[in-house]
């Protein structure tokens, strides 16, 4: 049986750390930023580590070879 292919959308959105945790970009930064404080905008920079249950779903379903 051939290997499962990695979902190309997940490949662009998620990364795996060395310990197997899943890193994703911070959501909610596309529009509507004028209403938010500078502190909120600043805190939304960078990436987040997904919780264990979400990370397990991403690893098994979308990144099978990662």
UniProtKB/Swiss-Prot annotation:
Example GO BP: translation
The entry's keywords: Ribonucleoprotein, Ribosomal protein
InterPro entries referenced in this protein's UniProt entry, alphabetically: Ribosomal_bL35 (IPR001706), Ribosomal_bL35-like (IPR021137), Ribosomal_bL35_CS (IPR018265), Ribosomal_bL35_sf (IPR037229)
Pfam families, per the entry: Ribosomal_L35p
Coiled coil spans: none
Family the entry assigns: Belongs to the bacterial ribosomal protein bL35 family.
Domain of life: Bacteria
Cellular component GO terms, alphabetical: cytosolic large ribosomal subunit
Listed GO MF terms: structural constituent of ribosome
Entry keyword annotation includes Methyltransferase: no
The protein's name in its UniProt record: Large ribosomal subunit protein bL35
HAMAP family: Ribosomal_bL35 (MF_00514)
Species of origin: Azorhizobium caulinodans (strain ATCC 43989 / DSM 5975 / JCM 20966 / LMG 6465 / NBRC 14845 / NCIMB 13405 / ORS 571)
Keyword Cytoplasm assigned: no
């Amino acid at each position: 049986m051939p290997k499962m292919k990695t979902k190309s959308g997940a490949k662009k959105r998620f990364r795996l750390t060395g310990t197997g945790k899943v890193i994703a970009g911070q959501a909610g930064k596309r529009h509507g930023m004028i209403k938010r404080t500078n502190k909120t905008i600043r805190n939304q920079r960078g990436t987040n580590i997904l919780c264990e249950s979400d990370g397990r779903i991403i690893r098994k379903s979308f990144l099978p070879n990662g």
